Amino acid sequence: MGVISGPVIGGNYGWPFAKSMLDVTSYGYEEAEYFIEGEATSYRQVDGTEWGRDGKWQAEPDKSSPYKTRLLVYRPTEQERFNGTVIVTWNNVTAGYELFGADSLEVLEGGYALVCASVQRAGIEGLPPVKQGLADWDSERYGSLNIPSDDFSYDIFSQIGSSVGPDRDFSAPDPMAGLQVKRVIAQGASQSAGRLGTYFNAIAPFDRSFDGFILSIYFGRGTPLQVGDELVNINNAQYNDSPADRLRGANVLRDDLDQPVFIVNSELEAMACYGVRQPDTSKLRWWESAGTCHVSQQSRAARKLMADRDKLITVDANDGINAIPIGPLYDSAFYHMHRWLSEGVAPPIQPRIDFEASGSIVRDDDGIAKGGIRLPQVEVPLAINSAIPLKPDIFAYLGGSSHPFSKEEVLARYADRSSFLKAFESVAKLAVEEGVLMPRE
């Protein structure tokens, strides 16, 4: 297990990179950053075994290397506020800097602890041409960090999970500040979900650092165990295929482990995963949300606020991308996974998006997807929101589209504002009753 040091303070900015935009103290929480260092192990495919569609992959230790990285912690200040669940999120590095959800109201109001784990090389070194990794952003604070290769990311993630779990070393600096941890959940979104897919299929059979897994906006394919010196970048010129082909599902999640798994996908990932969909079981929940997409106008706006504060250079969002945030479903997944592990109450099964035999989504006369989880903005629409992209590039592909109805079209649907609000509220209440939305939404 890695050695913990901290809390970390100082640096050029005086705050942790990509910290929460919320005043967490007003929720009875505190923010603290720690470093963890030690020896990490890489893994390789066991000789003579097949890494096939069934996800029952066999891995074994390969090499070892020293590492040093960070974990950003949000925890209740009082034991009475803590529900016993720690969520460890695998920070996403697709943008060339770290992204993670530190603004979850379910976390802050529900009494969880959140640990944002930096486990990939690009998070520290950034991606060319504009390098905005931790060491470049604040060399004084983060200049000593080092992850030699993403090959070691899986074990680093395990070590971070163990360092905040119930059997952690209490004699060392404690990222949980003495809180009585009962369970640890692994969470990852997008590229990080792909890495967790590989972790679940190849590492979880012999490593019990995590009690449950939440994979959000997951494309249905695991990432490699070994990439060597490569800085993984989906925008590399080496990719000549279309985004849809590049991100198409390729494998299922293994079905022989006792840790529960929760998939929360938008319409976009539902399309990608069409060929590797799995039925709901006693250990798997698979949600698909119609009318949503990988990225929304709301998530882009939230990211821009963080980027402006932390003085980052970002890619301008395409106008007209999807306008229905899927974020509220992430909070619901936290709530349901916590109950699943703590009380044995499985999350509610939800309908899947309707597909033609060809793999195309069945759409209504307006072009809105049929089936699936139907948020109020889908069931009582003011626009046609979908995962259909406006342009062929990767960023447009992830953003889908939103086509607002004209004033005349709105009036043809709803007699007046009151009628619209009544219908919207009715669907929202139903979503709460079905366990799709939390009451606060």
Whereabouts are the PLM-identified features?
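C-terminal His-loop and adjacent cap/lid subdomain of alpha/beta-hydrolase
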Residues: 1-441
